[in-house]
Amino acid sequence: PSLDEPMTTWYPDWATHGKGAITLRDVLEMEPGLAWNEDYDPANGVSDIVQMVAAEPDQLAYAESRPKEVEPGTEFDYSSGTAMLLSGVLQQATGMRADQYAKEKIFDPIGMTKVDWWQDAAGHTLTYCCLDTTTRDFARFGLLYLHGGRWGDRQVVPADYVEDSLAGAPNSPDLYGLQWWLDDPEGVPADHFSAVGHDGQYIDVIPSLDLVVVRNSTYVKDPGPSVADPNLFLKYPSDDLIPGKGTIPPDDWDESKTLAPLVADLTD
């Protein structure tokens, strides 16, 4: 589908709930205008992200139900709920779960062989998080984008989509594109972009240096099935007691401390 396809193509009831103008591009750019609170600290009350993860067996239905707050395309607001909407889009557009589609079209073609992408209790792939793989396989994904979506002699991701991904959203041109962060840590070239995951997972890509840097924290998935514990936050209100979590990065840990020395060595 076109990036400017209305989301009512996949969520037709939005047409009668004031959300008919929201496009797929708005969702990818985190600018759909939907109400959402991304506060992860349960001490501050039950935010949308806590509610979705802790109490909603069908996380996609919860994300879909969020009301419009502002006009789409007018404000950047990072939201796990917005990213979760992509799970429904992919499943309806392809007839496959998002993880199955990604395995066939992206992961297998680039050699990502050890991948586990979580689902909610209703069987929807968690497209806002929770893709477990190896550091080398994350690096493969970074290399795919470093090479403009091409892997060997195969164009795995359309080149024009890769270009759009890194162009910058209208209300966050130097911060966010289509599901990629575009901000530049101090001492790092301006063409840097990154994927940033939970608890210190990073894929940093710097095309001008032909460089991909992957950093994994010690986060380890809880043993058991690929389903997020619906009582995660309720059972473990303290952030450092949530099972499956590893060391917590210090408050002042930023990408520049990892990337800047590497960049300096490469450019000396």
Predicted regions and their residues:
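Amphipathic alpha-helical interface segments
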Residues: N44-R66
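Active-site helix/loop module of the DD-peptidase/beta-lactamase fold
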Residues: P1-A35, S65, M96-C129, T133
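Active-site Gly/Thr loop motif
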Residues: K114-V115, E163-V212
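Structured C-terminal helix/loop/strand segments within mature extracytoplasmic catalytic/sensor domains
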Residues: A195-D268
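Alpha-helical scaffold elements that line and support the substrate/ligand-binding pocket
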Residues: P1, V27, F76-I106, F138-L144, ...
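Solvent-exposed, acidic/flexible segments
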Residues: D4, H17-A21, M52-E56, E75-A83, ...
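Flexible glycine/proline-enriched surface loops and loop-helix/loop-strand junctions
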Residues: N44-G45, R66-P72, T82-M84, D120-L126, ...
